[in-house]
């Protein structure tokens, strides 16, 4: 008799769990966007990359702007293996970096769709540009990685034109450096 009562209670418990899951749905916890406002005094860096259309390695280029609390840099690479064509660095102060990070936060730099199906930008918008928005730890690993394209694809939810211009203005002669790069 005791077995029947235990079995009955387990069955009722399972029914309640199934009903709760159906009503509330099964979902993974929502990841909160990073708060960059506290990162100006750390080794955290932010990076914006323009990945040109898919083409022969000899004509493919990336423009990478990296900003940290001591310097900003622009790297032009050729091909798909990160071969550096040019690199220029500029001094950055903690105060300037603090304001820059705040501007990025206001314009949604850390907002994106975390759907795993959208995690990898490679191959998307093959004939257009891919824009990659990253927050990097002091060791260089991705803390956050979002992307958009000229084909209106991607998982980045921030203000694309403002974010791009904010990064470009961290490089004093951005226009002359990138003028001859075919994107």
Predicted regions and their residues:
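Short, well-ordered, aromatic-rich surface patches in folded extracellular/luminal domains
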Residues: 2-7, 13-55, 117-183
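Residue-level signal for well-ordered alpha-helical segments
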Residues: 27, 42-44, 77, 81-86, ...
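Extracytoplasmic/periplasmic/luminal assembly and interaction segments
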Residues: 49-99
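Short, surface-exposed linear patches
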Residues: 68-70, 112-114, 155-158
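A mature extracytoplasmic/lumenal domain signature
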Residues: 78-80, 104, 137-139
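Low-complexity, flexible helical/coil segments
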Residues: 81-86, 100-102, 110-114, 147, ...
């Amino acid at each position: 008799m005791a077995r029947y009562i235990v079995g009955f209670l387990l069955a009722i418990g399972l029914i309640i769990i199934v009903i709760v899951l159906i009503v509330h749905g099964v979902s993974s916890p929502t990841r909160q966007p990073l708060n960059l406002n506290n990162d100006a005094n750390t080794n955290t860096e932010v990076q914006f990359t323009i990945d040109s259309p898919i083409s022969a390695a000899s004509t493919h280029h990336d423009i990478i702007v990296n900003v940290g609390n001591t310097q900003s840099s622009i790297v032009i690479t050729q091909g798909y293996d990160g071969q550096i064509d040019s690199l220029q660095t500029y001094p950055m102060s903690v105060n300037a970096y603090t304001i820059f990070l705040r501007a990025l936060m206001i314009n949604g730099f850390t907002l994106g769709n975390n759907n795993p199906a959208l995690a990898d930008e490679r191959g998307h918008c093959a004939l257009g540009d891919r824009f990659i928005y990253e927050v990097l730890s002091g060791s260089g690993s991705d803390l956050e990685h979002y992307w958009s394209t000229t084909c209106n694809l991607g998982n980045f939810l921030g203000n694309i034109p403002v974010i791009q211009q904010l990064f470009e203005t961290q490089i004093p002669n951005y226009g002359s450096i990138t003028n001859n790069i075919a994107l």
